[in-house]
């Protein structure tokens, strides 16, 4: 588990670690252990049996950073680079509170992607999935870009993160369901590709 906590001027990519506690407890309740990775600048997690706040242990090292990503059952990541470690070693990942949206295309079909919500500040309405995957909004990466377009960023809440965690756990426990999910993921990508081809008038 890696939860990005950067400087205050980088709030676009940050997440509140406390909104992950319900998911952590879900994993532990199913017999798993959760290793929270990162560095000592991060917020300390509450003491929970089965949760290892790894950055604050004597075992913290670059080797262990890679080892944990390589040997985990799956990884939970945010808008930071660590999630690429488990992916490199063929492990599935759940990305939550993620921006930019179009990074979804860098994932394989067995992974789950839950981007941050984007709302129109003028109307108060959520921006549709179709618009999220357009080539302008989908590549926004800084607060100014969102502000200039009257877009508010809303983090996933703890229940959304928990529901996604339950989903990936169930997928890992049920091979048939995982095959169905992979097919749905491919179909979704095809639909978005067709939509963007209409906009740009060339194959994506």
What does each of the following model-derived ranges do?
Residues 33, 81, 174-178:
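Intrinsically disordered or highly flexible coil/loop and linker segments, enriched in small
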Residues 65-111:
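A donor-sugar binding/catalytic signature common to diverse glycosyltransferases
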Residues 15-22, 69, 162-163:
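Well-ordered, non-membrane alpha-helical segments in soluble/globular domains
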Residues 1-7, 17-61, 180-191:
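Catalytic donor nucleotide-activated moiety binding site of glycosyltransferases and closely related
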Residues 109-204:
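Leloir-type glycosyltransferase catalytic cores
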Residues 13-16, 61, 154, 158:
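Aromatic-acidic/polar surface patches that form glycan- and anion
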Residues 8-12:
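Surface-exposed cleft-lining segments at the edges of enzyme active sites
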């Amino acid at each position: 588990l890696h939860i990005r906590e950067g400087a205050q001027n980088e709030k676009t990519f940050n997440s509140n670690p406390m909104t992950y506690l319900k998911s952590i407890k879900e994993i532990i309740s199913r017999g798993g252990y959760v290793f929270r990775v990162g560095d000592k600048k991060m917020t300390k997690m509450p003491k929970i049996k089965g949760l290892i706040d790894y950055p604050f242990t004597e075992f913290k090292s670059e080797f262990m950073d890679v080892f944990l990503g390589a040997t985990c059952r799956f990884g939970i990541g945010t808008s930071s680079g660590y999630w690429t470690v488990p992916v490199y070693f063929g492990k599935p990942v759940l990305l939550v509170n993620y921006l930019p949206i179009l990074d979804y295309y860098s994932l394989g079909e067995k992974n789950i992607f839950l981007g941050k919500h984007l709302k129109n500040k003028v109307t108060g309405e959520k921006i549709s999935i179709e618009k999220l995957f357009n080539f302008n909004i989908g590549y926004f990466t800084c607060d100014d870009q969102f502000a200039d377009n009257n877009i508010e960023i809303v983090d996933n809440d703890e229940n959304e993160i928990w529901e996604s965690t339950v989903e990936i756990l169930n997928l890992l426990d049920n091979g048939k369901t995982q095959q169905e999910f992979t097919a749905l993921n491919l179909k979704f990508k095809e639909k978005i590709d067709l939509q963007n081809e209409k906009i740009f008038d060339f194959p994506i």
